[in-house]
Structure formats: C-alpha cells, structure tokens
C-alpha cells in the first residue's frame, strides 16, 4: 500500500512540477552523533492534488494489461510491476475522473514488461508493437490523443531503458524512444540525464519492491545506522555481455 501511494504521489507531483526525481542527489554527512541529509533529495509535494487534478484512465482491452498478468502472475512481484500498481491505484484514486471531457491528464494502462522468459526476464521485443497498437486504438476511439499527439497523456514504461525498449544500452540508444511516445509523459525507472532514453519531462520512479520484502527490512526508527539510504546503481549482465558493458542503470 505504501509503495502504491508513493507512485501516485510521483505521478501527481509531476503535473505541478513540484517534484523532480531524476538526478536527485542525496548527500549523507556524518557528524559525531547524528547523520544529516543535505542536497536536493527531491522537493516535497505540499499541495494536495485532489480536487485540482483529474486523470482519465482509458479502459483498454484486457490484452494490453490484465491478460498478460493472468498468464504470468510473476509480473505482480517483478521489479517492473509498477506498471500494474500505478494502474490499480489510479482506478480507485480520488483524482480519477470517469468523464474524459473534464480530464487534465490521460493515462493509458499498457503493460509492456509482462512478457517474461522461463527464468523471469522480461522480453521487450513485442513492447513497441503493443504500445503502437494501444495508441492507435486510443486515437481512433477517443478524440483526445489526436488533439496534441498525446501531450496530455502519460504511460508507465518501467523497462531498463524506458521506452527505448531494449535491455542493451547500445541497442536501446540506437532505437531511441518509441516515436509515437515522444510527446507524452513517460513514468520510468531509468533516470540518467542527458541520455537519449530519458526525455525532458519524464518522471523517474523507483523499481517495484513487494511490500512484504520492504516490511521485512524495516528497522525500528532509533536503530543507529551507518548507511542512511542506498540507491542501486549499475546493472551488469555478465551472461549476455561478458565484457562487462552496461546493462542498465538504476534510477
Ligand atoms: C486520429 O487520427 C488518426 C490518424 O490520422 C485517424 O485514423 C483517427 O480516425 C483519428 N481519430 C479520430 C477520433 O478522429
């Protein structure tokens, strides 16, 4: 539940430009008795978006979202499960509107990372086709996409290099962001600045971690800690890239 609300806050915060997650730096400074955080750890959203922001959630055919999860429930606990939980939380969110005419923002639930191999690795090779197909449908059935080619639309694209949809950096960069998504807002875990797979205005979010795993790590607040916060950084894929090239980067 907690993780879900964090993601919703991240999404809502973007519309008010109140939160800039990507590139945030947290410096942990040690002193004799206490640890202090300085730097820009991300601004806090102070305004309550309820009543000010309305999000319309497209009702897409199940093949774009719930069907793949039924087929492979491992998608629910995978690090890319954000695409599922953002969708679920928006469905019952106070910012949701059922009337697209009054919407400020449109969300299309397309789960592009739920095609897992036997060993649980997501295969993004079908993602571009799936995304293009969903957008074609949205553009045909509703008038809102064509007004601005999706400027007021957002998508969750949590795969390694976001909407570049490839797990190897060179190939992801050569592909670039899927053209049909270039005007929309992308919510993604990939957050490296000045990278072709991160466009301006994207929202960087943490990968999904199942609540029971998070809860298992909870420490009593008074516990002395030498590490205050830890961000997972580079990923290496020794199997596919024995030379040690980058596989993907954490947010
Ligand atoms: C939006 O544009 C596409 C491509 O030109 C077209 O096929 C579609 O019918 C348009 N949608 C609407 C609702 O007019």
Please annotate each region the language model reported.
Residues 2-251:
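Nucleotide-sugar donor-binding catalytic core of glycosyltransferases
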